[in-house]
């Protein structure tokens, strides 16, 4: 999906960097710094946008749920690097779902989809947090990083309840561990996750 269409922008109005699982490798950070260096006058916002059913997050969820399946990926350094980073977010999402719905939530038919949705939302928040810290480290405190999840099935950008920023309607990243914990609760208790679990 062209990002320009999602945000109703024209060609070249946005500087877009696409990467599996929203990973912040050297190439991605280099691309962001290029934009900061050469487009600074017009750059106002850094948006980290995940999407429902993300293939990289789905693969990490499957590795989490079925660790033996991870063995086929473990010999591929590049794929393993993506999944290893995402497994941290997946595990955090799994813990929040268990805390919210009970440990037997893993037996519910929609658990995999709920875990993917929660992990995608947590992942973009974590990446936005990291980008915001990088911007602050460069003295670019006027730039903000925000995040959201594009839902392919509804063609809308979703953010966890109570996190939307005005006027962007995207979410600010958490600022500390307590804020990450609160965000995890908001994601787990959201209608999106409840729907995936058939509640």
Which residues are covered by each model-predicted region?
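Divalent-metal-activated hydrolytic enzyme cores
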Residues: 12, 21-30, 37-43, 56-199
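Short, hydrophobic/aromatic alpha-helical segments in well-folded domains
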Residues: 2-4, 31-35
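Well-ordered alpha/beta subsegment
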Residues: 44-48
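N-terminal short beta-loop-beta anion/metal-coordinating cradle
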Residues: 1-16
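Short His-Asn-centered micro-motif
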Residues: 17-20, 49-51
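Gly/Ser/Thr-rich loops at beta-strand to alpha-helix junctions
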Residues: 1, 50-57
């Amino acid at each position: 999906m062209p990002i320009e269409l999602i945000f109703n922008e024209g060609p070249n109005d946005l500087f877009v960097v696409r990467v599996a699982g929203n990973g912040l490798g050297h190439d991605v950070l280099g691309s962001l710094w290029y934009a900061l260096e050469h487009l600074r006058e017009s750059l106002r916002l850094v948006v980290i946008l995940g999407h429902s059913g993300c293939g990289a997050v789905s693969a990490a969820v499957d590795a989490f749920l079925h660790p033996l399946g991870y063995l086929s990926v473990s010999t591929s350094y590049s794929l393993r690097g993506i999944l290893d980073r995402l497994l941290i977010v997946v595990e955090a999402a799994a813990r929040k779902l268990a805390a919210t719905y009970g440990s037997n939530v893993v037996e519910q038919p929609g658990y995999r989809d709920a875990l993917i949705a929660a992990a995608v939302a947590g992942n973009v928040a974590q990446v936005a947090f990291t980008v915001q810290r990088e911007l602050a480290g460069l003295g670019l405190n006027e730039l903000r990083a925000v995040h959201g999840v594009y839902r392919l099935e509804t063609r809308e950008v979703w953010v966890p309840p109570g996190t939307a920023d005005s006027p962007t309607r995207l979410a600010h990243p958490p600022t500390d561990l307590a804020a990450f914990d609160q965000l995890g609760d908001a994601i787990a208790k959201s209608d999106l996750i409840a729907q995936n679990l058939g509640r």
